[in-house]
Amino acid sequence: MDISVFREMVAKKPDGFLGRYGLGDKIMQNGENFEEAVEHLRVAVELDPVHVAAHFALGRALAALGRNEEAKPVLNAGIEAATSGRSNGGGDLVPEMRALIQKLG
């Protein structure tokens, strides 16, 4: 979907997970304003605290901003959600999340 579709979704329903996650992820994919991506992805994680991909996207956005100490607990929470069985998937992202945590130091 085009980024404008996600912006419309957020404007119409600011507390909607899909709009917030989609917009934050799309901003990341486009290499745009990572601060804005963090804003939307934080809301997405608050709305669905066991959505593994949202944790991964937020962790990547924080890391891109050099905010490594903020990124690590976000990534660890995503790993915990995936490995505890509380999430509906996302286990395939665990190796990438662990690798990013190691890279962050």
Predicted feature descriptions by range:
Residues 12, 46-47, 81, 85:
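Structural marker of alpha-solenoid helical repeat scaffolds
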Residues 63, 68-87:
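TPR/TPR-like (Sel1-like) alpha-helical repeat modules
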